[in-house]
């Protein structure tokens, strides 16, 4: 039986610009490019936008949802000590939430999850925890010896008609990212890259999220236990609506009854011991 070798991640040939834009200020040119990108994303054949069910976030995403045939990146936020391990679970959980929203629209399909023996995160996904968002029986785990094998498996998976592809990597690989983005666009299958280290500002990904765990609000009768909270930043939104904030950020809380994430109101961001500031009317 022949052995299939991983694809060489060679950069695609770049096409030169036919002409330089004339008479546009940098801000005007940037906004014009963004409009073209949004129009291009909305016109992609066979692709849909999946709402996250969080109005504040959906309002910034293209057509009010997450683009299916695209590459999305999720970073673990830095812990106070400088280590990211403390927030691995938050990044994994947010990824599982995104997958759950996508799978709500699909009754069938497998999720291909690729990682290395010494993965970017401390431990592989935990099936009972994933069951909060989707049936873990739909998960197919692939362990790759080398990072290039991991990217090869992801690209092959995007061509295989499955529901979604996830890969864990320690650092950004621009060439691999371009190939994955093109494969996702062609197949209409979403690809997710979970990264331990922050990536470059410029990227082909449709969205980039940074997720960190946050202190939960204690539930009466359960001591210090409370619903999970994550601090989520949308650090790149290639086809979406520009935000008034340079990097929009939300404190999200999981609701076990509604099975939804919701933005925590600003009044509930404070700790129990923090003093209230009272302003005269």
Predicted regions and their residues:
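Detector for small/aliphatic-rich hydrophobic stretches
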Residues: 1-113, 123, 129-137, 240, ...
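Conserved beta-strand segments of the P-loop GTPase G domain that flank and frequently precede/overlap
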Residues: 75, 113-115, 140-143, 165-169, ...
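Generic hydrophobic/aromatic pocket-lining and core-packing "Φ" positions
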Residues: 99, 154, 180-181
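Conserved nucleotide-cofactor-binding alpha/beta core module
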Residues: 108-163, 175, 185-187
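Conserved nucleotide-binding/hydrolysis micro-motifs of P-loop NTPases
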Residues: 117-120, 172-173, 198-200, 238-239
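Switch/connector loops and helix/strand junctions flanking conserved nucleotide-binding motifs
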Residues: 121-124, 201-204, 242
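A contiguous pocket-lining binding segment that forms or flanks enzyme active sites
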Residues: 162-218
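C-terminal functional extensions of proteins
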Residues: 211-281
């Amino acid at each position: 039986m022949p052995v299939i070798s991983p694809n060489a991640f060679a950069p695609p040939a770049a096409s030169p610009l036919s002409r330089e834009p004339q008479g546009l200020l940098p801000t005007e040119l940037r906004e014009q490019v963004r409009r073209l990108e949004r129009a291009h994303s909305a016109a992609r054949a066979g692709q849909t936008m999946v709402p996250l069910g969080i109005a504040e976030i959906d309002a910034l995403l293209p057509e009010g949802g997450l683009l299916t045939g695209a590459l999305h990146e999720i970073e673990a936020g830095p812990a106070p000590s400088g280590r990211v391990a403390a927030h691995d679970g938050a990044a994994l959980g947010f990824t599982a939430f995104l997958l759950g929203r996508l799978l709500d629209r699909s009754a069938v399909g497998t999720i291909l999850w690729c990682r290395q023996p010494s993965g970017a995160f401390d431990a592989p996904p935990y099936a009972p925890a994933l069951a909060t968002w989707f049936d873990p029986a739909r998960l197919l785990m692939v362990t790759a010896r080398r990072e290039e094998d991991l990217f090869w498996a992801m690209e092959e998976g995007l061509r295989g008609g499955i529901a979604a592809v996830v890969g864990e990597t320690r650092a950004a690989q621009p060439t691999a990212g371009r190939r994955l983005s093109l494969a996702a666009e062609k197949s209409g299958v979403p690809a997710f890259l979970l990264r331990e280290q922050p990536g470059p500002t410029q990227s082909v990904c449709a969205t980039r999220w940074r997720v960190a765990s946050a202190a939960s609000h204690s539930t009466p009768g359960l001591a210090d236990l409370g619903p999970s909270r994550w601090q989520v930043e949308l650090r790149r939104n290639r086809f979406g609506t520009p935000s008034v904030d340079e990097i929009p950020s939300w404190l999200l809380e999981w609701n076990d009854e509604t099975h939804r994430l919701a933005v925590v109101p600003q009044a509930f961001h404070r700790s129990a011991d923090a003093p209230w500031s009272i302003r005269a009317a």
